[in-house]
Curated annotation (Swiss-Prot):
This is Single-stranded DNA-binding protein. Interacts with the polymerase and the uvsX and uvsY proteins. One of its GO terms (molecular function) is zinc ion binding. Binds preferentially to single-stranded DNA and therefore, destabilizes double-stranded DNA. It is involved in DNA replication, repair and recombination. Binds ss-DNA as the replication fork advances and stimulates the replisome processivity and accuracy. InterPro entries: NA-bd_OB-fold, Phage_T4_Gp32_ssDNA-bd_sf. Keywords: DNA damage, DNA recombination, DNA repair, DNA replication, DNA-binding, Metal-binding, Zinc, Zinc-finger. It comes from the Viruses. SUPFAM superfamilies: Nucleic acid-binding proteins. Homodimer in the absence of DNA, monomer when binding DNA. One of its GO terms (biological process) is DNA repair. It comes from Enterobacteria phage RB9.
Length: 49
């Protein structure tokens, strides 16, 4: 079913499927760890009821 004939053909198919889609801008909902001056980070984990 999925027989590879050449790696170039596979790369072309992958490029066509991906379409170079990606994250062009930074996601505002993404959480990022904040570091202090010493380079240490901390987080508070809260469990919802």
């Amino acid at each position: 079913m999925f027989k590879r004939k050449s790696t170039a053909e596979l790369a072309a198919q992958m490029a066509k499927l991906n379409g170079n889609k990606g994250f062009s801008s930074e996601d505002k909902g993404e959480w990022k760890l904040k570091l202090d001056n010493a380079g240490n980070g901390q987080a508070v984990i809260r469990f919802l009821p």
